[in-house]
UniProtKB/Swiss-Prot annotation:
Subcellular compartments: Cell inner membrane
Enzyme class: translocase
Cellular component per GO, a single term: plasma membrane
Protein name: Ion-translocating oxidoreductase complex subunit E
Similarity annotation: Belongs to the NqrDE/RnfAE family.
Quaternary structure and interacting proteins, as annotated: The complex is composed of six subunits: RsxA, RsxB, RsxC, RsxD, RsxE and RsxG.
Domain of life: Bacteria
Principal subcellular localization: membrane
Source organism of this protein record: Escherichia coli O127:H6 (strain E2348/69 / EPEC)
Gene name of this polypeptide: rsxE
Membrane-related topology note: Multi-pass membrane protein
Length: 231
């Protein structure tokens, strides 16, 4: 159970692919102009990570070490092609919006990295969980960045959600404030870099506060009964 918890915590927070490893920044910065696009690509990446980790882990004993990387890429490309056709069939609007960034998941460092670092060494169940956790960590980072950019740039949230979830999702669109001219800095790549930098700073501050609390709690436990540690 502790190993399962560690895999989940590492994927979602401690070893977050976007905020700690800084992998996959090209789609992270390019696609997160809206929350819908960010969520769509994040979920697609999560599905690819889960399925590829599961497949590679299952076949790890039959994969020759000398040619393992080409085999990994072939498996990843097959899964990405299937996911691309799935999005094309059931979410065509999102497919058009994401464009080239769906097939580019094949070259995403996150996917290849987890295949080599985790799936090739661990069992199928734990590898699938690792892929799901890493994918959801990246999805959360993309969704937060996409939401911030959409709100600041357009004053809306979940604009175009029907492209991802169907026509019923039009009711999810929220207009937070009305603007006649979008704030282009937030919608263009410089805004993505600024937003990512703020998120990195925010995560660092949270980690430092959590570390300080753990240190203080450990110091209090180490003191004899009745002592407060004050001179």
């Amino acid at each position: 159970m502790s190993e399962i918890k560690d895999v989940i915590v590492q994927g979602l927070w401690k070893n977050n692919s976007a905020l700690v490893q800084l992998l996959g920044l090209c789609p992270l910065l390019a696609v997160t102009s809206t929350a819908t696009n960010a969520l769509g690509l994040g979920l697609a990446t999560t599905l690819v990570l889960t399925l590829t980790n599961l497949t590679i882990s299952t076949l790890r004993h039959w994969t020759p070490a000398e040619i393992r990387i080409p085999i990994y890429v072939m498996i990843i490309a097959s899964v990405v092609s299937a996911v691309q056709m799935l999005i094309n069939a059931y979410a065509f609007g999102l497919y058009q919006s994401l464009g080239i960034f769906i097939p580019l998941i094949v070259t995403n460092c996150i996917v290849v990295g987890r295949a080599e670092a985790f799936a090739a060494k661990k069992g199928p169940a734990l590898s699938a969980l690792d892929g799901f956790s890493i994918g959801m960590g990246a999805t959360c980072a993309m969704f937060v960045l996409g939401s911030l950019r959409e709100i600041i740039g357009n004053g809306t949230l979940f604009d175009g959600a029907d492209a991802l979830l169907g026509s019923w999702a039009k009711v999810l669109r929220v207009e937070i404030f009305h603007t006649d001219s979008p704030f282009l800095l937030a919608m263009l790549p410089p805004g993505a870099f600024i937003g990512l930098g703020l998120m990195l700073a925010g995560k660092y501050l949270i980690d430092e506060k959590m570390k300080k609390r753990r240190t203080e709690a450990a110091a209090e436990r180490a003191l004899p009964n009745g002592e407060t540690g004050n001179v």
